A protein has these predicted regions:
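Conserved catalytic core of two-component sensor histidine kinases
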Residues: 89, 96, 130, 137, ...
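Regulatory hinge/linker segments at domain boundaries
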Residues: 114-139
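Recognition helix of helix-turn-helix DNA-binding domains
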Residues: 143-178
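N-terminal regulatory/sensing modules of transcriptional regulators
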Residues: 1-116
Protein backbone atom coordinates (compact mmCIF):
# COMPACT_ATOMS: atom_id res chain seq x y z
CA UNK A 1 0.00 0.00 0.00
CA UNK A 2 2.86 2.39 0.76
CA UNK A 3 4.07 1.84 -2.81
CA UNK A 4 0.62 2.58 -4.24
CA UNK A 5 0.29 5.76 -2.19
CA UNK A 6 3.77 6.81 -3.33
CA UNK A 7 2.32 7.05 -6.85
CA UNK A 8 0.42 10.12 -5.58
CA UNK A 9 2.97 12.88 -5.13
CA UNK A 10 0.96 14.78 -2.51
CA UNK A 11 0.36 11.73 -0.31
CA UNK A 12 2.46 11.16 2.79
CA UNK A 13 2.14 7.73 4.44
CA UNK A 14 2.37 6.91 8.11
CA UNK A 15 1.60 3.69 9.92
CA UNK A 16 0.03 3.37 13.37
CA UNK A 17 -0.33 0.34 15.62
CA UNK A 18 -3.36 1.18 17.76
CA UNK A 19 -6.23 3.58 18.48
CA UNK A 20 -4.13 5.89 20.65
CA UNK A 21 -1.57 6.40 17.88
CA UNK A 22 -4.36 6.88 15.33
CA UNK A 23 -5.94 9.58 17.49
CA UNK A 24 -2.60 11.39 17.80
CA UNK A 25 -2.08 11.30 14.02
CA UNK A 26 -5.62 12.53 13.34
CA UNK A 27 -5.17 15.39 15.81
CA UNK A 28 -2.04 16.55 13.99
CA UNK A 29 -3.35 15.80 10.46
CA UNK A 30 -7.16 16.04 10.50
CA UNK A 31 -7.42 16.01 6.68
CA UNK A 32 -5.99 12.50 6.44
CA UNK A 33 -7.01 9.43 4.53
CA UNK A 34 -7.03 6.48 6.91
CA UNK A 35 -6.54 3.06 5.33
CA UNK A 36 -7.82 0.62 7.91
CA UNK A 37 -7.90 -3.15 8.13
CA UNK A 38 -10.83 -3.17 10.53
CA UNK A 39 -10.56 -6.88 11.26
CA UNK A 40 -6.98 -6.51 12.53
CA UNK A 41 -7.21 -3.12 14.26
CA UNK A 42 -8.27 -2.62 17.89
CA UNK A 43 -11.62 -0.95 17.15
CA UNK A 44 -14.39 -2.93 18.82
CA UNK A 45 -17.37 -2.43 16.52
CA UNK A 46 -18.96 -0.32 13.80
CA UNK A 47 -20.33 2.15 16.36
CA UNK A 48 -16.85 2.92 17.66
CA UNK A 49 -15.56 3.38 14.12
CA UNK A 50 -18.42 5.77 13.36
CA UNK A 51 -17.53 7.79 16.48
CA UNK A 52 -14.07 8.30 14.94
CA UNK A 53 -15.72 9.46 11.71
CA UNK A 54 -17.94 11.92 13.60
CA UNK A 55 -15.04 13.22 15.66
CA UNK A 56 -12.70 13.73 12.68
CA UNK A 57 -15.06 15.15 10.06
CA UNK A 58 -12.33 15.99 7.53
CA UNK A 59 -10.89 12.48 7.54
CA UNK A 60 -11.65 10.07 4.72
CA UNK A 61 -11.66 6.34 5.41
CA UNK A 62 -10.67 3.43 3.17
CA UNK A 63 -11.57 0.08 4.70
CA UNK A 64 -9.07 -2.44 3.33
CA UNK A 65 -9.81 -5.87 4.74
CA UNK A 66 -9.89 -9.51 3.86
CA UNK A 67 -13.42 -10.17 5.01
CA UNK A 68 -16.10 -7.78 6.28
CA UNK A 69 -19.62 -8.76 7.29
CA UNK A 70 -22.32 -7.31 5.08
CA UNK A 71 -24.19 -5.90 8.10
CA UNK A 72 -21.06 -4.01 9.14
CA UNK A 73 -20.52 -2.64 5.62
CA UNK A 74 -24.16 -1.58 5.26
CA UNK A 75 -24.11 0.21 8.61
CA UNK A 76 -20.86 2.08 7.95
CA UNK A 77 -21.71 3.09 4.39
CA UNK A 78 -25.23 4.19 5.31
CA UNK A 79 -23.99 6.23 8.27
CA UNK A 80 -21.12 8.17 6.71
CA UNK A 81 -20.35 9.13 3.10
CA UNK A 82 -16.60 9.39 3.80
CA UNK A 83 -16.09 5.62 3.91
CA UNK A 84 -14.79 3.62 0.97
CA UNK A 85 -14.37 -0.15 0.86
CA UNK A 86 -11.93 -2.34 -1.05
CA UNK A 87 -11.16 -5.96 -0.23
CA UNK A 88 -7.67 -7.43 -0.17
CA UNK A 89 -8.75 -9.97 -2.79
CA UNK A 90 -9.46 -7.17 -5.31
CA UNK A 91 -7.27 -6.65 -8.33
CA UNK A 92 -4.37 -4.24 -8.14
CA UNK A 93 -6.14 -1.88 -10.54
CA UNK A 94 -9.25 -1.84 -8.34
CA UNK A 95 -7.13 -1.12 -5.24
CA UNK A 96 -5.45 1.72 -7.17
CA UNK A 97 -8.87 3.13 -8.13
CA UNK A 98 -10.00 2.95 -4.50
CA UNK A 99 -6.94 4.87 -3.32
CA UNK A 100 -7.26 7.51 -6.04
CA UNK A 101 -10.98 8.02 -5.40
CA UNK A 102 -10.55 8.22 -1.63
CA UNK A 103 -7.67 10.69 -1.91
CA UNK A 104 -9.83 12.90 -4.12
CA UNK A 105 -12.71 12.80 -1.62
CA UNK A 106 -14.93 10.42 -3.57
CA UNK A 107 -16.49 7.27 -2.19
CA UNK A 108 -15.32 4.00 -3.69
CA UNK A 109 -16.96 0.62 -3.16
CA UNK A 110 -15.30 -2.36 -4.80
CA UNK A 111 -17.21 -4.66 -7.14
CA UNK A 112 -17.27 -7.60 -4.69
CA UNK A 113 -18.70 -5.46 -1.89
CA UNK A 114 -21.34 -4.02 -4.24
CA UNK A 115 -22.37 -7.54 -5.21
CA UNK A 116 -22.64 -8.53 -1.54
CA UNK A 117 -24.77 -5.47 -0.79
CA UNK A 118 -27.16 -6.22 -3.66
CA UNK A 119 -28.01 -9.65 -2.29
CA UNK A 120 -31.27 -9.32 -0.35
CA UNK A 121 -31.08 -9.79 3.39
CA UNK A 122 -32.14 -13.26 4.43
CA UNK A 123 -33.39 -14.26 7.84
CA UNK A 124 -30.68 -16.53 9.12
CA UNK A 125 -31.14 -19.65 11.15
CA UNK A 126 -29.28 -20.15 14.39
CA UNK A 127 -25.56 -20.36 13.63
CA UNK A 128 -24.09 -23.82 14.04
CA UNK A 129 -20.45 -23.89 15.09
CA UNK A 130 -18.58 -27.18 15.18
CA UNK A 131 -17.40 -28.47 18.56
CA UNK A 132 -13.83 -27.43 17.70
CA UNK A 133 -14.97 -23.93 16.69
CA UNK A 134 -16.96 -23.61 19.92
CA UNK A 135 -13.93 -24.63 21.99
CA UNK A 136 -11.69 -22.18 20.13
CA UNK A 137 -14.25 -19.40 20.57
CA UNK A 138 -14.29 -20.09 24.33
CA UNK A 139 -10.48 -19.86 24.42
CA UNK A 140 -10.62 -16.61 22.45
CA UNK A 141 -13.15 -15.25 24.95
CA UNK A 142 -10.72 -16.16 27.74
CA UNK A 143 -8.16 -13.90 26.09
CA UNK A 144 -5.89 -16.56 24.65
CA UNK A 145 -3.88 -15.69 21.54
CA UNK A 146 -4.04 -17.79 18.39
CA UNK A 147 -0.56 -19.17 19.17
CA UNK A 148 -1.58 -20.12 22.73
CA UNK A 149 -4.71 -21.88 21.44
CA UNK A 150 -2.63 -23.75 18.84
CA UNK A 151 -0.17 -24.89 21.52
CA UNK A 152 -3.01 -26.00 23.81
CA UNK A 153 -4.71 -27.96 21.00
CA UNK A 154 -1.45 -29.37 19.56
CA UNK A 155 -2.40 -27.76 16.24
CA UNK A 156 -0.62 -25.39 13.93
CA UNK A 157 -1.09 -21.64 14.18
CA UNK A 158 -2.55 -21.67 10.65
CA UNK A 159 -5.16 -24.32 11.51
CA UNK A 160 -6.40 -22.29 14.47
CA UNK A 161 -6.33 -19.11 12.38
CA UNK A 162 -8.51 -20.84 9.75
CA UNK A 163 -10.95 -21.86 12.49
CA UNK A 164 -11.02 -18.22 13.69
CA UNK A 165 -11.87 -17.01 10.18
CA UNK A 166 -14.61 -19.64 9.88
CA UNK A 167 -16.05 -18.63 13.26
CA UNK A 168 -16.10 -14.94 12.25
CA UNK A 169 -17.70 -15.80 8.89
CA UNK A 170 -20.37 -18.04 10.42
CA UNK A 171 -21.22 -15.50 13.11
CA UNK A 172 -21.16 -12.62 10.62
CA UNK A 173 -18.69 -10.64 12.72
CA UNK A 174 -15.38 -8.94 12.01
CA UNK A 175 -13.39 -9.11 15.24
CA UNK A 176 -12.89 -10.89 18.55
CA UNK A 177 -15.00 -8.41 20.52
CA UNK A 178 -18.05 -9.05 18.33
CA UNK A 179 -17.45 -12.82 18.26
CA UNK A 180 -17.32 -13.17 22.04
CA UNK A 181 -20.82 -11.66 22.33
CA UNK A 182 -22.06 -14.92 20.78
Amino acid sequence: LFYLFAEHKDAECKSVEDKAALIEQLKSCPNSVVVLDYTLFDINDASELLVFAERYVNTKWLLFSEDLSIDFVRMVLASCPRFSVVLKECTLSEIRMAITATLSGQRYICQRTMEMMLVPEVKEEKVKLTQTETEILKDIALGMTTKEIADKRFSSFHTVNTHRKNIFRKLGVNNVHEATKY
